[in-house]
Amino acid sequence: MTAAHKVKITYCAECGYEPQTLDLAKALMLEFGARLSSIELIPWEGGTFEVSVDGQLIHSMKRDGGFGDSAAIKDAVRTRLAG
């Protein structure tokens, strides 16, 4: 099975969000590894922390508040991968 799903995590580098970003990336790799073709980490600014799958935003710090629960983000990724 060829994985075609791409996850993108855009985070505020100037805010020091690297630990949360790396923790989430690791959790997603452990949970979905072979089902993903890539997990792209994009340093940004302005308090940004966003997670998208195949271009669809599934979590935004500004929209949803905070970093989000990793279990909830994994559920959203799972839903997106399912269909």
Where are these regions (language model features)?
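Short, thiol/selenol-centered motifs that function as redox-active sites or metal-ligating centers
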Residues: T2-L28, F32, E45, L81
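Short strand-loop junctions, especially beta-strand C-caps/beta-turns
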Residues: T10-E14, Q56, M61-R63
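Generic domain-boundary/flexible-linker signal
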Residues: E18-Q20, E50, K62
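A short linear hydrophobic-aromatic micro-motif
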Residues: L36-E40
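Structural micro-motif
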Residues: W44-E50
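Non-catalytic, surface beta->alpha helical segment in thiol-disulfide oxidoreductase systems
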Residues: I58-A82
